[in-house]
């Protein structure tokens, strides 16, 4: 069941710096999110990075 992320969750990926990732960026679809933030939340496998 897909639960619509809250605004906090949407912003989480852009604000969070994940240890071990290049430049400590959050991952989207397994790749570091270096621009903007994750579209969905928290590096889900089907996530994409978006500019925001």
Curated annotation (Swiss-Prot):
Disulfide bonds: none
GO cellular component: extracellular region
Keyword terms: Cell adhesion, Secreted
A UniProt-annotated Pfam family: Ornatin
Record-linked InterPro entries: Ornatin (IPR002463)
Similarity field: Belongs to the ornatin family.
Protein name from the UniProt record: Ornatin-B
